[in-house]
């Protein structure tokens, strides 16, 4: 969040950020079993990846972090969906980014590959934005950001959603809700 919201993200350092992260998530750090040197090396690597993306990839794609919201929440009663998107820029063309702390699907150098659950999540966000903000799918630019990708050019991957894909996802969601309702009713 601080890289996006600071006046100058270049001045934010990993060392200055760590005490703030510890203060915000003390229970998570104390209870985690795998917080060791390697954990912090991975965290530092992801931090540097995010800084690089902000300085190079964002400007190349016309994304302006200063015109963005961090973690806006959406509730869409019409679709029965809710969620919190990691990054949303509304001005100068709508752009949404969902951050994933893991690696993209194999092979990592195939920049068209995104995980199906991650793609579905972005598609549902796009559907909510269309419903809530009135921005048509074709006017939305969505990306998955895999911060542990080994290929620097492949961290930010576009996700385009079609109306047909959204219909399939919503139908699947409706079937799940129907089964859950039946289980709660009939056991």
Give, region by region, the residue ranges found by the protein language model:
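Mg2+/Mn2+-dependent nuclease catalytic core
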Residues: 63-178
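Metal-dependent nuclease catalytic cores that hydrolyze phosphodiester bonds in DNA/RNA
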Residues: 1-90
